[in-house]
Amino acid sequence: MSRSSKKGAFVEASLYKKVLDMNAQQKKKIIKTWSRRSTIFPDFVGHTFAVHNGKKFINVYVTEDMIGHKLGEFSPTRTFKGHSSNR
């Protein structure tokens, strides 16, 4: 089941505050976050986030096409090694 539309999109409060502070100061530093569940808002466009994938941080540069998606969608947690070719 999806989230109720009357609740609105979720974003970590501390993460959103960091983005708003950086927008006010006109800075573009990398923002480190563990919050993969946060929704990308239009205020995030142009910022780079270091999103944790369980082992290390993956840099994610936010563009307009990413609005409405989650940060975790762009930081894969599993590595695919490929199928064996011994047949």
Curated annotation (Swiss-Prot):
GO cellular component: cytoplasm; small ribosomal subunit
Domain of life: Bacteria
Entry keyword set: Ribonucleoprotein, Ribosomal protein, RNA-binding, rRNA-binding
GO biological process annotation, one example: ribosomal small subunit assembly
InterPro entries: Ribosomal_uS19, Ribosomal_uS19_bac-type, Ribosomal_uS19_CS, Ribosomal_uS19_SF
GO MF term (any one): rRNA binding
Described purpose of this protein according to its UniProt entry: Protein S19 forms a complex with S13 that binds strongly to the 16S ribosomal RNA.
Family: Belongs to the universal ribosomal protein uS19 family.
Record protein name field: Small ribosomal subunit protein uS19
Gene assigned in the entry: rpsS
